Amino acid sequence: MAENQQAAGNENQNQPQFALQRIYVKDLSFESPNSPLVFQEQWKPQVNLDLNTSHNKISDNQYEVVLSLTVTAKVGEKVAYIVEIQQGGVFMISGIEGPQLGQMLGAYCPTILFPYAREAIDGIVNKGSFPALMLAPVNFDAIYAQALKRKQEEAAGEAKEEQTH
């Protein structure tokens, strides 16, 4: 009976495991360079969202994933505000390697972090006396797939160049 429990324990160690250990704001910045004059403008902002993800290995099964967002809102040619946030998370991932690990770190973890970053951005924008900013959901799986395809195309292009030289 103890042998069965030990065998079951060994099987569980080889099973893919994922756990969120911590979510935190790593960096947050808000600028409103044209306040208070921008409040007199008719509020029809052009909102631009730039995003980036990065990750690093902390220990054997621990990874830090950082989602960086920059939101720029302009009214006409005037910048109403700029918000920059780095939303971080520590994730325990084991039993997952190769392309699956890349997908977890490049798409799944940022998908978990995004609502926290969106909430922090909305809160700081509101404290700046601007209307609520509801950022639309982001399809990190599609972004990750596009980035992977672009890397593969670049690698294929470099391989072709090496063959022609």
UniProtKB/Swiss-Prot annotation:
GO cellular component term, pick one: cytoplasm
Chief place of localization: cytoplasm
Keywords, alphabetical: Chaperone, Cytoplasm, Protein transport, Translocation, Transport
UniProt cross-references to InterPro entries, sorted A to Z: SecB, SecB-like_sf
GO biological process terms held by the UniProt record: protein folding; protein tetramerization; protein transport
Example GO molecular function: unfolded protein binding
Cell location: Cytoplasm
Family matches, as Gene3D superfamilies: SecB-like
Self-association and partners: Homotetramer, a dimer of dimers. One homotetramer interacts with 1 SecA dimer.
UniProt similarity note: Belongs to the SecB family.
NCBIfam families: PRK05751.1-3, PRK05751.1-4, secB
Role: One of the proteins required for the normal export of preproteins out of the cell cytoplasm. It is a molecular chaperone that binds to a subset of precursor proteins, maintaining them in a translocation-competent state. It also specifically binds to its receptor SecA.
Name of this protein: Protein-export protein SecB
Species: Marinobacter nauticus (strain ATCC 700491 / DSM 11845 / VT8) (Marinobacter aquaeolei)
Name of the gene encoding the protein in the UniProt record: secB
